[in-house]
Amino acid sequence: MKKRLIGLDKFFLIILKNIIKEEDIMQLYNTLTRKKEEFIPYVEGKVGFYTCGPTVYHYAHIGNMRNYIGHDILDKTLRYLGYDVKRVMNITDVGHLKSDSDSGEDKMVASAKKEHKTVMDIAKYYTDAFFKDFKALNCRMPDIVSPATDNIDEYIKIISKLLEEGYAYKAGGNVYFDVSKVDDYYQLTNHKEDQMVVGVREGVDFDDNKRNQADFALWFTKSKFDDQDLKWNSPFGVGYPGWHIECTGISLKYLGEYLDIHGGGVDNIFPHHTNEIAQSEAYLGHKWCN
């Protein structure tokens, strides 16, 4: 494959030229199989690359930025090797609760209250701050950056189909994904049902609306948090999307039904990426990520 030098900084090019040989085979670590594998995209020469972006309620810290630097190195290396890369990053500006287990206040709302600003003011300020740091680290801007709040119709479409096909259910005013309806829900991790609290960054509140402890919210209505600033009309009631459905909706919208690479922080393997796989493959009816 012919190498592409356009759009890559000189320092990075020098490094790549010194470490990559013509006969080298690109291998990537696959979290799903827990081993390095030869990278073969679904479509020869093209790469669909999705990365989970920041929740813009505060400044990104050095650990967050280390993650994005890693994605940037991979993005630039793929382009250097001649791949036609389309990289998409979301911006989470709604729906990410303080606990990954669907409990606690929305991080955006909490930050807005603390700083006496609107949620959208908070989102704009910290999004701008994030990309200022991103560029200062010489990271290449993704081809598409999409805020979660710009894609509500996508989430509604996906949730509606999941309800129709029995993968989701309504309870207590909210819509939940039923993890018992999918095979090998824990394929990305070693977690089990009775270990669900492990890996959740903050305390787990029991939700008696759920059929299974590991079920997760696709859509919250006003029955969950009456003071939620951002709400939209939907067939399920006035409310807002859950965190996990946002990445699925944005990825499918911009990259289609087959994804080559999904990147994110190791702290998102469970439950976020685990839930993404479950809902995406239930919706699509086939394997989602390469």
At which residue positions do the language-model features occur?
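Polybasic, lysine-rich low-complexity intrinsically disordered segments
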Residues: 2-4, 17-18
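Short, Lys/Arg-enriched N-terminal segments with co-localized hydrophobic residues
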Residues: 10-25
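Alpha-helical recognition segments enriched in aromatics with Gly/Pro capping
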Residues: 24-57, 72, 132, 154-290
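N-terminal, positively charged nucleic-acid-binding surface of large information/translation enzymes
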Residues: 33-36, 42-138
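Surface-exposed helix-capping loop/turn segments at secondary-structure junctions
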Residues: 82-85, 136-143, 168-169, 258-259
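Short, glycine/charge-rich beta-strand/loop segments that flank catalytic centers
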Residues: 88-95, 123-130, 140-155, 173-182
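The substrate-binding groove and active-site-proximal loops of carbohydrate-active enzymes
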Residues: 112-118, 144-149, 237, 265
